[in-house]
Design a protein with these regions (language model features):
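Basic, glycine/lysine-rich polyanion-binding surfaces/domains
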Residues: 1-244
Length: 244
């Protein structure tokens, strides 16, 4: 039996490697660039993350509708003072672009069309100490998020075809990565997160990772702040699988 081109045994073996000594897989992401002198200021008013004060050059954030519901959960990459990349699950790039275009008034910034970009995801047992993991030159490297998750992510932003092909060698099946994602409670757009989701439903660790409560105002902030002031006590949707 095969799962998306891989056998069940290959998927299980890949998943066990991700949990153990380490392995890597490849997923496709949508990437939108925001460039220009006002890029950082504009994103600061649109994203839940404090883009200006990011401790590293990458951070997770919500992009919200004015109602406070989720448009996208994405990762921000700061490439330079006037250049940012927004990385989101494949198929959601246009929703991000359309939402950002909506309030782009008298702002010196340009929002690109989404483009498909490979993301190398390396995972290993969190009890292991790893050094010297190489990534292709031209990658934007970030630490992954999620309870019990250890590894690194490399977004192949400006990578040669040869280096990209080399990075894909010996990759575990994408289904192994998906199993890992679900097992660690990491939400994805279109499944756990939809246009009807409010951020609090994603879980407290996602809020802690993606929302700044000390920055200035941003679109959709009111609902997030109100729920936080009430202890973030919101129902969390679950999915029940029946094998009958």
């Amino acid at each position: 039996m095969a799962v998306s081109g891989a056998t069940v045994d290959e998927v299980i073996s890949g998943y066990e490697a991700l949990l153990g000594d380490g392995a890597h897989g490849v997923v496709v992401r949508d990437v939108i660039s925001v460039t220009g002198p006002d890029a950082g200021r504009y994103l600061q008013g649109q994203l839940s993350q404090d883009v200006v004060a990011m401790a590293a050059d990458q951070a997770w954030s919500f992009l919200l509708a004015p109602t406070g519901r989720v448009v996208a959960w994405l990762r921000v990459h700061r490439i330079g003072a006037d250049e940012y990349l927004l990385e989101v699950d494949a198929g959601w790039g246009m929703a991000v672009r359309s939402r950002l275009d909506r309030f782009l008034l008298r702002t010196d910034a340009v929002i690109s069309e989404p483009r498909r970009t490979a993301l190398i995801q390396r995972r290993w047992n969190p009890t292991l100490v790893r050094f010297g993991d190489e990534v292709p030159v031209g990658s934007s490297v970030a630490a992954p998020v999620g309870p019990g998750v250890a590894g690194l992510d490399a977004l192949l932003v400006d990578v040669s075809d040869e280096a990209g092909s080399e990075a894909r060698r010996d990759a575990v099946p994408e289904a192994s990565l998906e199993r890992y994602r679900i097992a660690h409670g990491i939400p994805a757009m279109g499944t756990e997160l939809t246009e009807d989701t409010i951020p609090g439903e994603a879980g407290s660790w996602v809020i802690d990772t993606s929302v700044s409560f000390t920055k200035g105002c941003y679109t959709g902030q009111e609902l997030v702040a109100r729920i936080d002031s009430r202890g973030n006590n919101v129902p969390h949707p679950i999915r029940i699988l029946s094998l009958a």
